[in-house]
Amino acid sequence: MRIEDLIAAARGELEADLLLEGGKLVNVFSGEIHRADISIYGGFVAGFDCPSARRVISVEDHLIAPGSIDAHVHIESSMLMPSEYARAVVPRGTLTVIADPHEIANVLGVDGISYLLRCAEGIPMRFLVTAPSCVPATHLETSGAALGVSEIASLLDDHRVVGLGEMMNYPGVIHRDKPVLAKLKVAASKNKTICGHAPGLGGRDLHAYAAALIEDDHECTRAEEAMEQLRAGICIMIREGSAARNLDELVKIIREYNTPNIMLCTDDLDPRDIVHRHIDHMIRRIIEAGTDPVAAIQMATINPARHFGLRRTGAVAPGYRADIIVMDHDFNVRRVIFEGEEVARDGRLTASFESKRLPVQTSMNVRLPITRESFRIPATGRIVRVIGVAPNQILTETIAARPEVRNGEVISDTRNDILKVAVVERHRATGNVGLGLVSGFGLKRGAIASSVSHDSHNIIVVGEDEESMVRAVESLISMGGGWVSVDGTTIASLPLPIAGLLSERRVEDVVEEAENVIAASHSLGSELEDSFMTLSFLALPVIPELRITDRGLVDVREFGHVPLFME
C-alpha cells in the first residue's frame, strides 16, 4: 500500500475498504472511550469519519479496541503448531504474540526457531519471537543445542526477532560472566529489547541486574517484589499461566501513574486452558478488580507494542495497523479484524488459511537398546536421596529414606510411594541414563513417561517396575516423543512428533489426548491432578531443591551433582 493512498483515504478522497460504524473507541492515547466510525484502507486505519466504504459493519453499542498482544509466551507449552495456536487464540482477540522459543531451541537449536517462524507464515496473527538467551540452561545436563553470541547475533538480525529472550542466568549477570554479558551487549548494540527473569532478586543484586540493561520481568509472584522492580526501572509483565497464576496478587501494584510500565502475558499455558482463556480473560479480571478499563487494555496493547518497538501497532488510530477487536460491554470479544480483514466472529475463526506441515529433523537420537539393565540400581548403601514432589508445586524437597532392596538391587516401594525415576538422553546418543527415586506420584503399577522435560527435554520416566519403564521409553521413541501411560502395554498416548514437544493435530484433539493420558495415569494410582506437569519439571536443575538429569541427581542449592546414596 502506498502512503499517498492512505492519506487520500483519510481525507475521504478514496473509498475505504471497511467501515466500523457506530462503535465506542477505547482510545489508548487519550485515555478516553469515545464514539468513532473507524475507516480502514489497505490494512491500516485511515481515520474516524470516512464518508463511505466498500463494506460497512455496524458495531452500535459495542467497544472497539486494539488487538491484544501476549508479551511473553512459550508456545511449546500449548503443544500446538503456530497455525493451530492461532485458531485457539485469535477468536479471543490476541493478534500478536512475543514468543520465546527456548524449548524447541534446546532440542533443535536455531533450526527449531526458524522452523516455527516458517510455520507461522500466513497465519492471521503476528508471530514474533525473542532470541533465547540461555540454551542450554545449565552445564548439568545434555541438551540438543547451544546458542552462543554468534547464533544470537544472527537471530537478532531477523526483523521478526524483537529482543533477547528472558535472561534466566541472573547470577551470571550480576557476577559479570563474560559470555553472558556478551549476549546482553550484542542485543543492546542492535537496539533490541532485553527480557528478564529474576524471581526473588532484590536490593543491590536487583540494581545490578537492572544496570545490565534488563528491561522487564514476568517472574514476580508478590506485589512487594514487583514494586521493587518497578522502582528499579524494570517493566512488569503480569503473568497468568497454567501453573503460575500471579494476576490476583499483582493487580495490587496497579496505580494510575505506573500503568505504562505494566504488560500482560501468559508465559506457559497448556492446551486445556488455552481453549478457555487468554489475554481477554486477564483484561476482564483486571477490570473486575477495579482497574480503569482503558488502562487494562493499554497493558495488553500499546504498552507491549512500545516496549518491543512495534511501530504502528497496538492502537486504533490513523496510520496504525488495523488489528482491531470489537467487544460487548462486558469486554467479551465479538469480532476480530487482522490487518483490515475480519478473521473471527463470536468465538469462531472465520479466516481460511493453510496449516503448514513442513518436514523437521528427528529429535529422537537415543542409543539403543533400552533394557531392564538401563534402569538397574545396585544397592551400594543404606540411605538414599529421594526427590519429594507435592501436588500443584514445581519445587521439590530432598527426602532421606531407606530403600527397598531385592537381590542386591533397589526396587520401587509402592507402600511408601517411592518409585524409580530415570532421565534418558535423547539428543546425541550418549547413552546417558540418570537414575533416581521419587516420592509423590503414587503409582501402584506401570509407568508414565514424557519427552517434555524442561529445559533440555530429554526423556523422563517414572515407574513401578523396569519392564514398564522400558516399554514407556520405547513407545515414546517410536512415536517421536510425547506423553505415555503404560500398564503392560501402552494404554494412552499423546504423540508430539515435532521436536518431542509439539503436535500436528487440532487443539480439540490435543486436549482430548492429554486428558486421556492423565486419566490413564490416575488409573495406575497417581493422585496428582496433572502428573505430566509435575513430571516435566523434575529434570529442571535451576529450581530447588533436588532434581534429576541424564547425568544424575542435582542439588540445586549447591548447583552440582550428588550421589543417590547418602550413606
Curated annotation (Swiss-Prot):
Listed GO MF terms: adenine deaminase activity
What keywords sit in the KW lines?
Hydrolase, Manganese
The record's annotation in CDD domains points to: AdeC (cd01295)
Q: Which residues cross the membrane?
A: none
Query: Which Gene Ontology BP annotations are present?
Result: adenine catabolic process
Q: Which InterPro entries has this protein been placed in?
A: Adenine_deam, Adenine_deam_C, Amidohydro-rel, Metal-dep_hydrolase_composite, Metal_Hydrolase
Record's catalysed reaction(s) = adenine + H2O + H(+) = hypoxanthine + NH4(+)
EC number from the UniProt entry: 3.5.4.2
User: Entry's Pfam families?
Assistant: Adenine_deam_C (PF13382), Amidohydro_1 (PF01979)
Cofactors that this protein relies on: Mn(2+)
Q: Which domain of life is it from?
A: Archaea
Q: Which family does it belong to?
A: Belongs to the metallo-dependent hydrolases superfamily. Adenine deaminase family.
Q: What is this protein called?
A: Adenine deaminase
- Gene name of the record: ade
